[in-house]
């Protein structure tokens, strides 16, 4: 069991499974996954052993609510979201790399120097709401974002920035996010960059990826790299030349698979990636260019838009990595109609995935593997490779 002072003192209970031995956590997650798929024919499925995480120090991102005073800021959480007096400082949270606590100490000093008064929820006054810190495991470089109520402190931040960069030379991307509302919203729409660089370079399995502000990126790099590598290995076994990556984000799945397929089969691979976030599409397109993948088209669209394009060349493989709600009945039925040879389904919610697989009546699961992306909690990721059923 992790030695966590915050849990033992009942200050933070985010890690609800902390007292459960790790191997038991894995067993319970595997049992839960199988229960969600109980109505499917899994008789011929190859169940791979769960991919385990490090138990602590595995997170590459810290989301710290800022409270307290400008002289003594507190970075962590509020036990009671409406009570600034319930603040808990989580700078030594064991889920973060140990060196994050040193960075937090430097940032507290910066908050004082720049006069960033922590936002007081009860009084609806103050400026600084959150500090968001992300680290690239490939380079050790950092992305730092200050979530502020207004632009009022921008001149002071710019004035103090050179001193901060002296103390933290690994800071690659620094930005201000403006969130003016008095609401439980993490970030606003407007991002003001204080550095020339706007993306944090990462690299998994030789695939360059770019983490961007306001964008989704897995918070457990070791397990994320394992997830992408497994997807790559599974699909490279088959002669696939045309693939779609729906809900593609920064292109992790599609780029891994396209590169492996091109190397394995020696032919150009056509990759179409669909993602609603335009900044994610920029990042994915940049990665494809670095990899020298020429027949790649990343588009900023809703995943449902693929159902409107009847003339698109039919894919051999469709990758889906939807949000927790799953892909739904309509998209499932569309996939049944266009009948790609394979579907690779990555899910963070086995319950909705189980329902989607019931709708995918033309497909049977070949391989299933659990990835423990979120140790000390009941959550996990799962990867399923589906093959089109042979018609007798």
From Swiss-Prot:
- Any idea which positions bind S-adenosyl-L-methionine? 218, 247, 275, 321
One Pfam family cited in the UniProt record for this chain? tRNA_U5-meth_tr
Catalytic residue positions: 348
- Name the HAMAP family for this protein: 23SrRNA_methyltr_RlmC
Please list the residues that bind [4Fe-4S] cluster: 4, 12, 15, 93
The root-end lineage is: Bacteria, Pseudomonadati, Pseudomonadota, Gammaproteobacteria, Pasteurellales
Superkingdom of origin organism: Bacteria
User: What name is this protein filed under?
Assistant: 23S rRNA (uracil(747)-C(5))-methyltransferase RlmC
Q: Which reaction does it catalyse?
A: uridine(747) in 23S rRNA + S-adenosyl-L-methionine = 5-methyluridine(747) in 23S rRNA + S-adenosyl-L-homocysteine + H(+)
**Coiled-coil regions, chain positions:** none
Extract one GO BP annotation from the record: rRNA base methylation
Species this protein is from: Haemophilus influenzae (strain PittEE)
The entry sums up its family as follows: Belongs to the class I-like SAM-binding methyltransferase superfamily. RNA M5U methyltransferase family. RlmC subfamily.
Instruction: Kindly list the GO molecular function terms attached to this UniProt entry.
Output: 4 iron, 4 sulfur cluster binding; iron ion binding; rRNA (uridine-C5-)-methyltransferase activity
Q: Which CDD domains match?
A: AdoMet_MTases
What EC number(s) would the UniProt record show?
2.1.1.189
